[in-house]
């Protein structure tokens, strides 16, 4: 093997396999674009995003790490969320949870 060389196995990688997901419609009611990152606790996103907020407690976007979804002003789109894993404790973000889910 050459230093830095990748040995990639054939096949697909399935993200978040076996975790509960939720599909919902989200609308940007504001006048500015809003971008939400892959690991942001969706329950705590910008208040200008309109959706069933209580249903999203303990969930994040079901997209690849390091990516984001952008909502343009007036735009409505379907997104898929996935349950947070690990210890299921949330601190920071908008400060709406600050502890166990």
UniProtKB/Swiss-Prot annotation:
Chemical reaction(s) catalysed: urea + 2 H2O + H(+) = hydrogencarbonate + 2 NH4(+)
An example Gene Ontology CC term for this record: urease complex
Keyword hit for Aminoacyl-tRNA synthetase: no
Keyword Zinc: no
Assembly: Heterotrimer of UreA (gamma), UreB (beta) and UreC (alpha) subunits. Three heterotrimers associate to form the active enzyme.
Protein name (Swiss-Prot/TrEMBL): Urease subunit beta
EC number(s) reported in the record: 3.5.1.5
Gene3D superfamilies: Urease, beta subunit
Record gene name: ureB
Subcellular localization: Cytoplasm
MF annotations from Gene Ontology: urease activity
EC class of the enzyme, as a word: hydrolase
Family that this chain belongs to: Belongs to the urease beta subunit family.
Pathway(s) of this molecule: Nitrogen metabolism; urea degradation; CO(2) and NH(3) from urea (urease route): step 1/1
BP terms from Gene Ontology: urea catabolic process
InterPro entries: Urease_beta-like, Urease_betasu_sf, Urease_subunit
Range of residues in the leader sequence: none
Keywords from the named record: Cytoplasm, Hydrolase
Pfam families recorded: Urease_beta
């Amino acid at each position: 093997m050459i230093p830095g060389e990748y040995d990639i196995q054939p096949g697909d990688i399935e993200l978040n396999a076996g975790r509960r997901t939720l599909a919902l419609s989200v609308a940007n009611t504001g006048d500015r674009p809003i971008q939400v990152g892959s690991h942001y606790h969706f329950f705590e996103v910008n208040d200008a995003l309109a959706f069933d907020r209580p249903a999203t407690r303990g969930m994040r976007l079901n997209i690849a790490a390091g990516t984001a979804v952008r909502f343009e002003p007036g735009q409505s789109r379907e997104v898929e969320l996935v349950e947070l894993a690990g210890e299921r404790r949330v601190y920071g973000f908008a400060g709406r949870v600050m502890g166990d889910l």
